[in-house]
Amino acid sequence: MTKKNKSAIQRRLIPTYIFLIIVSFISVFPLYWMISAATNTSTDVSRGRILPGSHFMENFHNLTSQQPLWRALGNSFFYAILTTVICLLICSIAGYGFEVYHDKGKDRLFSILLLAMMVPQVATMVPLFKMFSKAGLLNTAVGFILPIISTPFMIMMFHQNARSFPVDIIEAARIDGLSEVRIFFQMFIPTMKSTYAAAAVITFMNAWNSYLWPKVIMTDNKAMTMPMLIANLITGYVTDYGMLMCGVLFCSIPTMVVFFVLQKQFAEGITGAVK
């Protein structure tokens, strides 16, 4: 390829680069504004100041003195990690079973499972609250994670990825005398690391950012999560936006770290699910 052709191609790519720069700016600016607002006073934020200030420690002190920040962070980590581990185990077993075992009625059951994705969460919230209240599960980890540890989307995701798992390996393992449990844990799980990583990212972020159900089920401030804490910072009279953005920053850091660490595996797992 001649230099003239390369120059022509580069000129044609200029609009694409400009578009990507604009999209990147639109995507990154809210994150920058959140960090900047966490370092400014509420008055500066209200006036539209976008440059970083020097009031982060003041906002942080106000946040920790007025709200149980560390308790909320600990609760969110505990609920999110526990939900992720249990959800991955249950949904992967279900997705694996739907693909590997060929029983009568399997397809109908899977269709019913997919139809459950059409039911909004708010439609089942009141019945679930009454059931959990009678069972004494209010303000408990079980009450938090039970409705979300098995989601149709996660089961479908593992089911789609399980299609790439070689059936011949399963048959060979059975001939060698491996139990179904050992086949799943020693052969299926190691080959589906990307799927597990993608599912872990989605489940962790959903559990961490969950607000409506914890707000209903958690009536004790000792069980408060980070989204509930942030909601408490928004009052009907005067809202300290600097302190609010400081809380949002602490709430956002864990999910950003999880995504950045597992972004490669996340992309691979999602790609495998849509094939």
Which ranges hold each PLM region?
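A structural signal for multi-pass alpha-helical bundles of membrane permease subunits
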Residues: 4-275
